């Protein structure tokens, strides 16, 4: 009985919304660049996209069921907005030593299986996700490029249905990017990220 209670408690903690204090970026902050290894073996940074109007930075992973549930929607966001100047940049923040299945080889396999149209980067040393303040996978930061600086315009969830894409009624990230493309601020600038905790030792 006690074992079952512990399992249920662990499951609840794993998936509950991110409510802890965010030590990273807030809306309006300027995000610093990074250089991280991609699944294709190359290093990728935001500076590699000089023509971009901004970025959809998604902290996601291989093993979280919420991240897996969002994969097709993340692909759709990239397909919808990449040619309009807002490409998706996916970053796996998990320490593979803390969670099996998050190794670069597994990331490469997953990217190939799902035919990711965007970079899938490994946060080696887990230095980038704390800068952003990501606490869950998935956790999204929409950046708007202004005067050569990447300003945070939206933080949080992709939409309002973490489990079922058919039940989405609020498309937070898409709405934010569409507003930025019109030269406007997003009506909704921050939501709670719902997903799995980031794994670290």
What residues fall within each predicted segment?
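Bacterial Sec-dependent N-terminal signal peptides
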Residues: 1-21
């Amino acid at each position: 009985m006690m074992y079952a209670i512990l399992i249920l408690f662990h499951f609840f903690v794993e998936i509950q919304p991110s409510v802890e204090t965010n030590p990273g970026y807030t809306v309006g902050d300027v995000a610093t660049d990074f250089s991280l290894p991609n699944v294709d073996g190359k290093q990728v940074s935001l500076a590699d996209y000089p023509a971009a109007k901004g970025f959809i930075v998604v902290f996601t992973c291989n093993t979280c069921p919420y991240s897996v549930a969002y994969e097709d929607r993340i692909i759709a966001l990239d397909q919808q907005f990449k040619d309009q100047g807002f490409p998706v940049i996916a970053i796996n923040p998990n320490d593979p030593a803390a969670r099996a299945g998050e190794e670069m080889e597994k990331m490469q396999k997953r990217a190939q299986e799902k035919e990711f149209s965007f970079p899938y980067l490994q946060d080696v040393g887990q230095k980038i996700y704390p800068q952003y303040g990501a606490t869950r996978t998935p956790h999204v930061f929409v950046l708007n490029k202004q005067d050569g600086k990447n300003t945070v315009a939206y933080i949080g969830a992709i939409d309002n249905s973490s489990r079922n894409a058919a039940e989405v009624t609020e498309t937070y990230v898409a709405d934010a990017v569409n507003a930025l493309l019109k030269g406007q601020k997003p009506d909704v600038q921050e939501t709670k990220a719902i997903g799995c905790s980031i794994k670290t030792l």
